[in-house]
Amino acid sequence: MTLIEDSRQQKTKHELKHAYWSEHGVRVFRSKLLVGDYALMPSLAKIVDTKASMAEIAQNIGGSREEHQRFIRELKLAQEVGSKLFVLVENTEGIECIEHVISWHNPREEYSAKCIQGPQLAKAMRTIEGRYGCMFMFCTPEEAAETIIDLLR
């Protein structure tokens, strides 16, 4: 099995994933992907876009207008090219599904009262799934490499 990793992914931040793939005989080829971070060769029917934390996806969805628009452009592009996009949110808060997001507390609230909170984030995720055909998935950083392979198969 050969996995394509977007060349814009920072190599040193994904060593845990690379170690897992190496142990399991998964070859990793780095190349620029049109959308997302990971796909299987030769098909781009399924793509995984990884988020390093709940805070990152909260910024993508409820952060600045520019950040939100960039995220939506990526979702639309995946939809236009016929790829199923999985947004995989790595987290250590025990969040395993969108329903768990409702009880998530945004640590940025300490600095900004306007930041998106769990209930609004969960509602936005459901809306985005319905509108753009993507799926939000959740796992721990330790599970990410295996989850990426499972989603792409």
Q: Regions from the language model: what does each represent?
A:
Residues M1-S43, I57-R153:
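Non-catalytic C-terminal interaction segments of nucleic acid-processing enzymes
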Residues K46-A52:
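Conserved catalytic cores of phosphodiester-cleaving nucleases, focusing on short active-site segments
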